[in-house]
Amino acid sequence: MVAASRRKLQRSTVVNEKTGAYDVHPDRTSSGTHFERAENELVARIERRISELLGVPVENGEPIQILHYTPGAEYRPHWDYFDPAHPGNEKVLAMGGQRVATLVMYLNDVESGGSTVFPDVGIDVLPRKGNAVYFAYTTVDGQLDRRTLHGGSPVVAGEKWIATKWLRERAYAPASA
C-alpha cells in the first residue's frame, strides 16, 4: 500500500467546521491519499477483515486513508468525530451520519517519534509495523466522548506510514462533486 500511495500523495486536509470545505491546516502537516472501497483486491481484503473483526458493515467505512509523515510532520490533538454544533459539519454528517470509530494501522516502524497520543487519558501508542489502535467515540449513554482527543506526535527521525479507517453510523455515501 505504501508503494501504491507514494505517487498519489497530496497535503492532508481537515474539514472546515464553518464551511464544510476540505482545507489545508497547520495542525495537520502530513501527506495522504486514499483507496476507494474495493479499489483493488488488497483493499477489498483489508476492508472485509476490518468488517469481520469489528462487526461493522463494509459500507459504513470511509475510504482507507494512507498517511505519510516525514520528520517534523504531525497532526496536533483533535477529535475524529464531527461536532454537530458546527454548521460546516452538516455536509459531512449527511454522508453516512456521525463517525463512530477509528482504526489506525501502522505500516512501518518509525526510527523516532510519531507516536499516537491521547493526552486526556495519558496513552501514548508507539508506531510499530503490524500493530493497530482502535477507538470508538461514544460513551455508554451514546454521547460523543471528548476523551478520544488524540494526535500524531511529530516524527523525529525516519518516516511514518499509517492506514486509517474511519467508521460511520450508516453506509458512507460521499456527496457528488
Q: Where are the language model's segments positioned?
A:
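Fe(II)/2-oxoglutarate oxygenase catalytic core
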Residues: 2-177
